[in-house]
Amino acid sequence: MTKSLLVVILASWLALPQPPQETPGLLVSADWLSDHLTDPQVVILHADMQKSRYEAGHIPGAHFLDMNQIVWEGDPAWGTEMRSLAEINDALEMGGVSEGQHLVVYASNPLFAARVFMTLEVMGLRGSVSMLDGGFGGWQEDGHEISIEAPMFNRGSISLTAQDDILVTADWIHQRLADPRTALVDARPDDEYTGEDGGLGGTAHPGHIPGAAQMYWEELVVSRQSPTVHSFDQLTELFVSAGAEDGDTVVAYCMVGWRASFTYFAARLLGYETKFYDGSWRDWGTRED
């Protein structure tokens, strides 16, 4: 091989997206992220509905991800319908995301980060997205630097391919109500699960899906204000108590798909085969069959 050809091959290889300096898991710590702020193959996404909160302070180098480009209001004031693959693809490219990069998503509201995580897995980025443990609040509590400067970046280039086996429908669930290896986990609080709320959001039939176990999503973290995820052993105990044994399929749902996003994330963290019922109780509770 001539020296000139070797130089060309090496230059071509360097032009390809390189993996992060260290492969992260689904959950990364503030210290890990602090060590990777300058890693060109790690893109940090600050997820929020309002850009003003991002502008008031964010993790250095973080790109703003508008939650309105991830979800839209299918019904007034609910804002929970997943946008199309093309729309989310465009949102990521506008956020400077390109093929081969690893995404770390965080937010002040842990449900925003979890919803983005779930959505990006549905859009084919499983293995390429992580969530920041403790969120933005945890980052600040740990004394890490905050910036008000928006980073400069070019539009990214990525081509998403949806993963069709994550989202499930009411019919899919109905066919598996008697399946002992399918664990339905309701991420809502007690009053919604029991139906004492009277039918939040105008659902015709208050209550829960037959056989579903109730595990309020906030049980998965230290607190909503300090959303550090509980230990692996603590999470395992919660899911086993909810009827999810090793090898089972966990199906997460809530009212409209926000709270269940965190349940989805926790189940993935534990290694369960995990499904997401995006229609949730707003769909099931209005059905007549």
Regions of interest found by a model, annotated:
Residues 237, 242, 247-289:
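C-terminal soluble interaction/assembly domains
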Residues 22-49, 61-67:
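Mature N-terminal segment immediately following signal peptide/propeptide cleavage
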